[in-house]
Amino acid sequence: MHEMSITQSVVEICEVHAAGRKVTEVVLLIGELSGVVPESVEFCFEACSKGTLLEGARLQLELVLGVGSCPACHGEFPISTLFEPCPGCGAFGLSVVAGEELRVKELELE
């Protein structure tokens, strides 16, 4: 489960930005195409934050839906995998416009 190491990194990043202040809430963006399972991050958060400035903090996850762009017809549309054909023209080789995110959006501090 790579979500454990990802969650540990999120906690470390938050501690750096908290600059010694207690964190009460973390808002994390997770893209649908990022390969990260949101439920696993939620499960790992309590264990990873124990004994840190984030202990007891609320974790709010915001899912970013996948959006692709077609190189042939330049259309943009929702995607749920990286290997879908364009629904407009059937071309492959889509570029991801959104959905690969994994980042801390907000920290609430005491």
Swiss-Prot record:
Signal peptide: none annotated. Keywords: Metal-binding, Nickel, Zinc. Ni(2+) binds at H2. InterPro entries: Hydgase_Ni_incorp_HypA/HybF_CS, HypA/HybF. The keyword Nucleotidyltransferase does not apply. It holds the Pfam family HypA. The keyword Zinc applies. GO terms for biological process: protein maturation; protein modification process. Zn(2+) binds at C70, C73, C86, C89. One of its GO terms (molecular function) is nickel cation binding. PANTHER family: HYDROGENASE MATURATION FACTOR HYPA. Belongs to the HypA/HybF family. Involved in the maturation of [NiFe] hydrogenases. Required for nickel insertion into the metal center of the hydrogenase. This is Hydrogenase maturation factor HypA. The lineage of its organism: Bacteria, Pseudomonadati, Thermodesulfobacteriota, Desulfuromonadia, Geobacterales. The gene is hypA.
